[in-house]
């Protein structure tokens, strides 16, 4: 009987027992992390980070930064000041939505449409204005009914017509008056005298002339009475 007492075979440990020697500490260095190219990291991050309409990325939401996603039914009781909510950062729009945009003439007073009167209506209004500048309410109603107009249209027309009339009066008063010139030659005595003198000047002959005194009148009688000699005038 062969009794061989052999010690049980223990698998040789490939690992050296840990000790506090410097050699053992330096032997078990932590493995360096695998280097990742920056371009690969940027592309992978850009695919997970949403972009705004104008090209600037938002900060990643907590669901992207957290290693383990939260349960959808679980809501956080607090918000970290340096993290954004799941809805992202509220960014105001650069241009307002056309539906909510303020219209340019919203607060401005809308201009009313101008009323166009017919020739017969204008003629009736002008005739009444020549007679009466101001109308009472019953008179306006009566005139509006006769001309197929509303009371407001008649009232507005009379107001504008009075303003136009006042402007015309003011313009006529501001215009300088022409200075009073000499009266016409026919209507004034000086003019008649000047005309007579002009006619007399035209009837005179041209050149110098001498006025002579008239001779004494001589009665011609009988030849004997005058004498025998010749009589010289």
From Swiss-Prot:
Keywords: Activator, DNA-binding, Homeobox, Nucleus, Transcription, Transcription regulation. Its main location: nucleus. Residues 160-233 are annotated as: Disordered. Residues 171-180 have a biased composition (Basic and acidic residues). Residues 213-225 have a biased composition (Acidic residues). Residues 110-169 bind DNA. GO terms for molecular function: DNA-binding transcription factor activity, RNA polymerase II-specific; RNA polymerase II cis-regulatory region sequence-specific DNA binding; sequence-specific double-stranded DNA binding. GO terms for cellular component: chromatin; nucleus; transcription regulator complex. Disulfide bonds: none annotated. SUPFAM superfamilies: Homeodomain-like. Pfam families: Homeodomain. Belongs to the distal-less homeobox family. DNA binding protein that function as transcriptional activator. Is essential for normal postnatal growth and nursing. Is an essential factor for neuronal neuropeptide Y and agouti-related peptide function and locomotory behavior in the control of energy balance. This is Brain-specific homeobox protein homolog. It comes from Homo sapiens. The lineage of its organism: Eukaryota, Metazoa, Chordata, Craniata, Vertebrata. The gene is BSX.
